[in-house]
Amino acid sequence: MSHDHKMAAVIMDVAGRNFYTIKIKDLSTGEWLKDEIKDTRNGCIWTTDNKSLVYGVPDKETLRVYQIKKHVIGDKAKNDVVLLQEDDQTLDLYAYESRSKEYIFAFASRTDAGIIKYTKANQPDVFTTIEPMSTDHYYTVDHIKGDEFVVRTNYQAKNYRLCKTKIAAPAKENWTDIISARDNVFLETVEFFKDYFIAQESTNGLTTLRVISPNGQ
């Protein structure tokens, strides 16, 4: 659904093998636009100006998503712009929208590492790296509000910790703890909301949910 609720991007598997076609419907008239984007994967994201879609392109043989493209509504798919291309065949790309809807993240991962890049969601262009890839380092990133990203990471934390960092200086040397690393508690996931977070944690095989403020209290 576009941010102004005037258009819907409908994703259909018409060929099998998880190759999807994206079509656009005008919700005020009920008519389908001429836009048709074939052979996509992993859904799509509306830009906040409601003028474009961002989507992933898979390799037709390996099914690995290797490109993130931008489609301008009303234009032909052949004119879509490549925002990011991953040539390392061990990495699979996935684009997702921040909780604030202000940023689009591109996550490239393999079995032993991952890397995240970001761009503005109003007019996505060049993606900027948050922290370069390193073996055995996994991290996820989100944006809730303001000038900071939140980062869940296993850097110096085998059971993961939750950090924050200024968007202007997102590298790991600038990460400061919201939830510090703990030897006996595994930080499984964190769901982010405007005024609080919900942390799912595991201790001695038991899973608990904990509501915390953005400063970790």
PLM region spans:
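Peripheral, non-catalytic segments that deliver or gate enzyme domains
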Residues: 1-217
